[in-house]
Amino acid sequence: MIRAAGAVLWREGSVAVVHRPRYDDWSLPKGKLDPGETVPAAAVREVREETGFRAVLGRHLRRVSYEVAAGPKVVDYFSAWAASGAFSPNDEVDELRWVPFAEASDLVSRDTDRVVLEDFLAEPADLAHVLLVRHAKAGKRDNWPGDDDLRPLSAAGWRQAAGLRSLLPLWAPSRVHSAPRVRCVDTVRGVADDLGAAVLLEPRLSEEGYWPDREAALVRFLEIADGTGASVVSSQGGVIPDIVSTLADLGGLPLDGTPCKKGSAWLLAFRRPAPGWSTSDSSTGWPRLVAAHYLPTALPTP
């Protein structure tokens, strides 16, 4: 199976559509994964190579599958904001057009691209994003003689944390939050260090802080989601599935389950609420979860 990734690259009410002379078609930017590359990293790289723009990833749109001469091909598409850059013709793409949102489907050549664009247009382009991470591996509790709050990452856990340090910046987070346990903080400390920021401790998002006042914890999570830019939140396996499933239920978003492996992340996209929203308002006025995509690992798949 051929793995590939691409994006709906957008700015100011328009999306980028590229012309590929090899196929003489108009397409969304996409391409095959390089060896040792994750799907999100491939999406960002392919956008840069084909369009010249630095992409900041947003929500996962869909996975499409089709047959090519070399066999089945699977492409994951993300929404992506064009943060900076300029187009220059290159070996793969000889023309780029910025097309109004509503007109892009008329230009692309493939029906699969039209389906991806339909998904993109179903929600506002400018959504709020939270990357909800389960802490990396920290060995077995029974093998740690000290306070469990201080149980450190294992060697495998540090490798997972290094993968997250490379992966999570693709969404350009501006803040890093964590449950207070050492293994949660250390899982995302590298991301915070690269931002030159401190990890913001969130006691309500630990297992011992969440369940005694679940509603207050969910409200705190939504407050984080409503911040400027994307946020990273590191928490625990006893909390994350309930956060995701509860917010999905509130948003009317169907899910096929809420897996939560150590070192994994949920990419959550929220429709922004009206300014001045309050928890005293009806929950229909809160940030609304409109997309949830599970990233089972930050490490490249062999």
Give the positions of each predicted feature:
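NUDIX/MutT-family hydrolases
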Residues: 87-124, 295
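N-terminal strand-loop-strand
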Residues: 1-28, 130-135
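Active-site-adjacent beta-strand/loop module that shapes the phosphate/pyrophosphate-binding cleft
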Residues: 64-87
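Active-site-proximal alpha-helix that buttresses catalytic centers in soluble enzyme cores
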Residues: 31-33, 42, 126-212, 241, ...
